[in-house]
Regions:
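A short glycine-rich, Lys/Arg-flanked "PGG" loop and its adjoining helix->strand segment in the class I
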Residues: 130-142
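Substrate-binding/catalytic lobe of Class I Rossmann-like enzymes that use SAM or dcSAM, i.e.
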Residues: 158-254
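A short SAM/SAH-binding and catalytic strip from SAM-dependent methyltransferases
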Residues: 109-133
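Conserved SAM/SAH-binding beta-strand->alpha-helix loop
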Residues: 68-69
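Conserved class I S-adenosyl-L-methionine
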Residues: 35-44
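Class I SAM-dependent methyltransferase Rossmann-like catalytic core
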Residues: 2-32
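Conserved beta-strand signature within the Rossmann-like core of class I S-adenosyl-L-methionine
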Residues: 139-153
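Conserved SAM-binding loop of SAM-dependent methyltransferases across substrates and taxa
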Residues: 45-58
C-alpha cells in the first residue's frame, strides 16, 4: 500500500526526492568523496539508493537495513545486480534500536555515510528527532555523515492532499491498522465503522492522521475494552514539517 501511495500524484515526496538526487548528484558526490561506505535505513525500494550510488564516485560498500526481511533481501539483490563492483550487505533490524554496526562493514576504513531518505524523521517529534540524530552520531563516529530526507513546510492544501489521495490508498493504509488488530491481535473491531482523516495542524507544524469513529462503539482486545463516542478518533500518525533553519538547528544541536 505504501508503494502505491508513493506513486500517487498527490504524494510529492518520493518523486521530488528522486529528482533532487538525480539533479544534484555531482554536488552530493563531491561532498561525500570517493570509495564511500553507504548504509541505508528503511530500504523499501531501490530507486533512491540506485540514484545515489550512480552519482557517487566508486562507492565501496552498501549495507541495507530494514525490519522487513522480504524487502531487505529484494533490495540487496537488486543493488548487487545493478552495481557489481559494490560490496553489498543486508541487516534485518529495527533501525531505531541499532547501537553497533556489523564488524564486516566499512572495510575500506572510510567513515560511513547513512542514507535516510523519505522524510521518515518527520514521524518523530522534534525532540525525538534530535535524540535519534544523537544516537546516529554515536553510531557513525566523529567523521561519519548523514544524507537525510526532510519534508519542508508548504501550503496546507498540498499537505492535506498528500495524506488523503483521491484513490484512497492512504485511507486504506491507515485503516489497515484496524484490520491487522483484528487479524493478528484478535481484536473485536468493526473496521467499517471508522474512516480516515488527515489534516495539517499549523500550530504543531505536523500532518496528523486519525481514524474517526462513525458511531458509539467499543473495541476489545487482550482483555481490555475501549469505548468510543461518535467522531472520537484514534490518532495514528504524525508527520512533522520543518523550515531549513529549524531542522538545521536540531541537527547542529545533536552532533551534525
Amino acid at each position: 500500500l505504501f508503494n502505491k501511495i508513493c506513486e500517487t500524484p498527490e504524494y510529492y515526496v518520493t518523486r521530488t526526492e528522486i529528482s533532487l538526487l538525480n539533479n544534484n548528484g555531482t554536488e552530493i558526490s563531491a561532498l561525500i568523496g570517493a570509495a564511500s561506505n553507504v548504509m541505508e535505513y528503511g530500504c523499501g525500494s531501490s530507486l533512491k539508493i540506485n540514484a545515489l550510488l550512480s552519482a557517487l564516485h566508486e562507492p565501496a560498500e552498501y549495507l541495507a537495513i530494514d525490519i522487513s526481511h522480504e524487502h531487505l533481501i529484494q533490495t540487496a539483490k537488486s543493488v548487487a545486480k545493478t552495481f557489481p563492483a559494490v560490496k553489498v550487505g543486508a541487516l534485518c533490524a529495527d533501525f531505531m534500536e541499532i547501537v553497533d554496526l556489523p564488524n564486516k562493514f566499512g572495510g575500506t576504513g572510510k567513515a560511513p555515510l547513512l542514507f535516510f531518505p523519505g522524510s521518515t524523521i518527520g514521524n518523530q517529534t522534534p525532540g525525538e528527532a534530535g535524540q535519534f540524530l544523537g544516537r546516529v552520531r554515536n553510531l557513525l563516529g566523529a567523521n561519519g555523515s548523514i544524507l537525510i530526507g526532510v519534508d519542508l513546510k508548504k501550503d496546507k492544501n498540498i499537505l492535506n492532499r498528500a495524506y488523503d489521495d483521491a484513490e484512497g490508498f492512504t485511507a486504506a493504509f491507515n485503516l489497515n491498522l484496524l484490520k491487522r488488530m483484528k487479524n493478528e491481535l484478535k481484536a473485536e473491531v468493526d473496521v467499517g465503522s471508522f474512516y480516515h482523516l488527515a489534516f495539517f495542524n499549523e500550530q504543531q507544524s505536523r500532518v496528523e492522521m486519525h481514524l474517526v469513529s462513525k458511531r458509539a462503539q467499543t473495541i476489545t482486545f487482550e482483555g481490555s475494552t475501549f469505548e468510543f463516542l461518535p467522531d472520537e478518533t484514534i490518532h495514528t500518525e504524525n508527520s512533522y514539517k520543518y523550515s531549513l533553519k529549524e531542522f538545521s538547528k536540531i541537527a547542529e544541536n545533536n552532533g551534525f
